[in-house]
Amino acid sequence: MVKSHIGSWILVLFVAMWSDVGLCKKRPKPGGGWNTGGSRYPGQGSPGGNRYPPQGGGGWGQPHGGGWGQPHGGGWGQPHGGGWGQPHGGGGWGQGGSHSQWNKPSKPKTNMKHVAGAAAAGAVVGGLGGYMLGSAMSRPLIHFGNDYEDRYYRENMYRYPNQVYYRPVDQYSNQNNFVHDCVNITVKQHTVTTTTKGENFTETDIKIMERVVEQMCITQYQRESQAYYQRGASVILFSSPPVILLISFLIFLIVG
């Protein structure tokens, strides 16, 4: 008896759900469609009328005479006369006043300095025998032991380089050789380049510049050494027999 009651309730619930789904499918969408009597803009016409009710004169959609969509006369889409797309008269299409070139997007300007800097950082510099140009660095804070040189450096640090030239670390036996070569080529290149622009360096400038570039070359050596050892460790890891066997097994599973 209980089972029959449960079965009856399940049947009633199923029929009710099925009826609700059918009603949802047949239920019309609110707002009305094209010429269904609705209005997309309430208060602009009587029910069942046009979507854009006339406001006197002209044909359907002609507020002040003229063709369709002509508020003040003119061709199609001409608010104040003129060719299509001419808000206030003028020449041909797209030549309406100050907006004459709106349909022609302006070409983006390429900042050649940024392109050159991005291409040069870490790349081999032509004409320097395999030297590379490092990334830009913040100029280090250095104390030179006397107030005059400290103040001179703070006032003139923008005149000193913020990038160094160097060769790969695997071409040097130790850090001192790398730094010595890095300082010489960087100071030389910066001095020659700046001198050609009409700016000369004093003995104080050269002394301070060598100290600044030395610190930057040490930083560059540490970066390059770390990257070099990481690359070497990766090669050793992936060249070991267990790793090769594991990779081969995974490839076999994927392909097979």
Swiss-Prot record:
Residues bound to Cu(2+) 2: H72, G73, G74
Region Disordered: start-end pairs: 28-110
Positions annotated to bind Cu(2+) 4: H88, G90, G91
InterPro entries, A to Z: Prion, Prion/Doppel_b-ribbon_dom_sf, Prion/Doppel_prot_b-ribbon_dom, Prion_copper_b_octapeptide, Prion_N
Lipid attachment site numbers (GPI-anchor amidated alanine): A233
Protein name: Major prion protein
Lineage, opening ranks: Eukaryota, Metazoa, Chordata, Craniata, Vertebrata
Binding sites annotated in the UniProt record for Cu(2+) 1: H64, G65, G66
Tagged with keyword Membrane: yes
Quaternary structure, from the entry: Monomer and homodimer. Has a tendency to aggregate into amyloid fibrils containing a cross-beta spine, formed by a steric zipper of superposed beta-strands. Soluble oligomers may represent an intermediate stage on the path to fibril formation. Copper binding may promote oligomerization. Interacts with GRB2, APP, ERI3/PRNPIP and SYN1. Mislocalized cytosolically exposed PrP interacts with MGRN1; this interaction alters MGRN1 subcellular location and causes lysosomal enlargement. Interacts with KIAA1191.
Protein family according to the UniProt entry: Belongs to the prion family.
Organism: Rupicapra rupicapra
Domain observations: The normal, monomeric form has a mainly alpha-helical structure. The disease-associated, protease-resistant form forms amyloid fibrils containing a cross-beta spine, formed by a steric zipper of superposed beta-strands. Disease mutations may favor intermolecular contacts via short beta strands, and may thereby trigger oligomerization. Contains an N-terminal region composed of octamer repeats. At low copper concentrations, the sidechains of His residues from three or four repeats contribute to the binding of a single copper ion. Alternatively, a copper ion can be bound by interaction with the sidechain and backbone amide nitrogen of a single His residue. The observed copper binding stoichiometry suggests that two repeat regions cooperate to stabilize the binding of a single copper ion. At higher copper concentrations, each octamer can bind one copper ion by interactions with the His sidechain and Gly backbone atoms.
Keywords: Amyloid, Cell membrane, Copper, Disulfide bond, Glycoprotein, Golgi apparatus, GPI-anchor, Lipoprotein, Membrane, Metal-binding, Prion, Repeat, Signal, Zinc
Extent of the Sequence repeats: 54-62, 63-70, 71-78, 79-86, 87-95
Signal sequence interval, chain numbering: 1-24
Subcellular location: Cell membrane; Golgi apparatus
UniProt KW Iron keyword: no
Spans annotated as Interaction with GRB2, ERI3 and SYN1: 25-233
Single GO cellular component term: side of membrane
